[in-house]
Curated annotation (Swiss-Prot):
It is found in: Cytoplasm. It holds the Pfam family CDC37_C. Forms a complex with Hsp90. Interacts with a number of kinases such as crk1. The gene is CDC37. Residues 494-508 have a biased composition (Acidic residues). Its main location: cytoplasm. This is Hsp90 co-chaperone Cdc37.
């Protein structure tokens, strides 16, 4: 049976977690690279959330002012810029602009959880314009773009309403995007989320002294006063339990329902959907991996058609599992995800169907290619054994390779004059310096292939010190599926909101 490395494909680590990595990858290097990637994504997500929050707040204030002017002033009065600004300044604070602290104070507990822990620099707040000034600029812009509005008040009102409708459209789209960003943020736990659940102290009282009839007996010693403090920490880390080889194999065992699902023809999507609705528990990453292992075995036996069919069925489980949090969601939510996904791929000409089949082909071709390599290696090993008459122990090598298909390793030369560049030129052997200067990970791996494990690990430590290896990500065309995930997330959120509306007055 071929070795399955898929358990390392989707590793996600936090700042302080211990992880298990591929034997050929340096553990500390992987953790540093992955942490850097997580921090960058977290920072970028917070920047987007802050930008959208400012935009939504600003547009809501602008609409409020435009509505007020349209209600209080006639078409003729709107042509007089001085009168417009005088009316505006009398009703609204001329200096009012975006103020995060004031927003938190005004909204209170009604402000959503993901918006309460943002940090704004002083420059970010100061650089935002006043709302009244923005209205004044809007009038100037409309009159410059449409000269007839300088004398025709009705035309001016028409363009003001048109601009307001565009703002409403932007508000709608940005609200959806903010919901998605906050949903992503809520799925991750960072150190800021950890807090004391409760902290309680109590004092043991002295036991009442019993009156002793016999005065000659010595009195019992008085009870000592003690203070006990109990602290509970929310989201305390769970001890890491290492799985044995048998447990790992048990995790990849195919359930009977999954075996039945694998027999359903690929072109009968309606039957597949009906089966999954009756057995939502198999829509997990674990069962998908078990089917992929079966596909490997079939391809090694040159049963390509059967292997591709198994890949098709396994990806159905994967897509539904990703939409429903890999089996962690309630059965009703998993069923909703099944119905939603199959409705998107039902039509032959739909982009979702095309993207799904493309993923099936790519996955099958990858398995096919790996099996060819495995067969070739088996032939070479057999030939070597026949030639030498004995089994030779293979020497372990360290090779740098990205474990995730959506990331790649990059080779970076440190900037001259920095501490990293000094380490690069003084500690690294000249062979590795030349390989890094080519900026090719293959050239670096060629040098690693010449070293023993101990020497290669020492080189990896120097790599960490001078930062010559980095991780960069790329995104394939999965727009349709990402939109599908967003749609499902919003439907689930709406259902949960409806269920909790009867018992909660406010929603974080």
């Amino acid at each position: 049976m071929p070795i399955d490395y898929s358990k390392w494909d989707k590793i996600e680590i936090s700042d302080d977690s211990d992880v298990e990595v591929h034997p050929n990858v340096d553990k500390q290097s992987f953790i540093r690279w992955k942490q850097r990637d997580i921090h960058e994504k977290r920072m970028q997500r917070n920047i987007e959330i802050k930008s959208i929050l400012i935009q939504l707040t600003m547009y809501a204030k602008l609409n409020e002012r435009v509505d007020y002017l349209l209600e209080k002033l006639t078409s003729t009065e709107l042509l007089d810029s001085e009168k417009v600004m005088s009316k505006l300044n009398s009703e609204f604070d001329p200096q009012e602009k975006f103020d995060y602290d004031k927003l938190i104070k005004d909204k209170g507990s009604t402000l959503r959880k993901g918006l309460k822990d943002l940090k704004f620099d002083r420059e970010e707040i100061e650089n935002t314009p006043c709302y009244n000034e923005m209205i004044e600029d809007l009038f100037v812009q409309i009159k410059d773009d449409h000269p007839e509005t300088k004398t025709d008040g009705d035309k001016l009102i028409e363009y003001l309403k048109e601009h307001r409708n565009r703002i409403d459209d932007v508000l709608s789209k940005q609200t959806i995007k903010l919901d998605d960003l906050l949903y992503q943020k809520a799925q991750l736990i960072v150190s800021d989320d950890l807090h004391t659940g409760f902290d309680r102290s109590f004092l043991n009282k002295d036991k009442p002294e019993e009156k002793e009839e016999n005065q000659d007996k010595p009195k019992a010693p008085e009870a000592k006063k003690t203070t006990v403090t109990t602290t509970e920490t929310i989201n305390s880390p769970k001890p890491v339990e290492e799985n044995t080889d048998k447990e790992i194999l048990d995790e990849l065992e195919i359930l009977p329902a999954t075996k039945e699902f694998a027999k359903i023809p690929s072109d009968n999507l309606s039957k597949a959907a009906e089966f999954l609705i009756k057995h939502p528990s198999i829509c997990t990453e674990q069962q998908k991996d078990a089917l992929i292992m079966t596909a490997f075995d079939l391809q090694l036996e040159n049963k390509s058609d059967e292997a591709k069919h198994i890949v098709h069925q396994s990806l159905l489980l994967q897509y539904v599992g990703q939409l429903s949090d890999n089996g962690k969601a309630a059965p009703a939510n998993v069923i909703n995800a099944i119905k939603l996904f199959f409705s998107k791929i039902a039509a032959e000409s739909s982009p979702a169907k095309h993207a799904f089949l493309e993923d099936v082909n790519q996955t099958f071709n990858h398995i096919k290619g790996r099996c060819e390599i495995i067969k070739e290696e088996q032939k070479q090993n057999a030939a070597n054994k026949e030639g030498t008459g004995e089994e030779e122990e293979e020497e372990a090598l360290i090779q740098l390779k990205a474990l995730d298909d959506n990331t790649e390793l990059s080779v970076n030369i440190p900037q001259e004059g920095t501490k990293e560049y000094e380490i690069f030129t003084t500690k690294l052997p000249i062979e590795f310096q030349n390989a890094i200067k080519t900026e090719s990970i293959d050239e670096v791996n060629k040098e690693f292939a010449k070293l023993k494990i101990e020497d290669a690990e020492r080189i990896l430590e120097i790599f960490n010190e001078c930062g010559v290896i980095g991780i960069s990500g790329y995104i394939e065309d999965e727009k349709e599926f990402e939109e599908l995930k967003k749609e499902y997330a919003h439907e689930t959120a709406n259902q949960e909101e409806d269920q909790s509306a009867s018992v909660e007055d406010t929603v974080d």
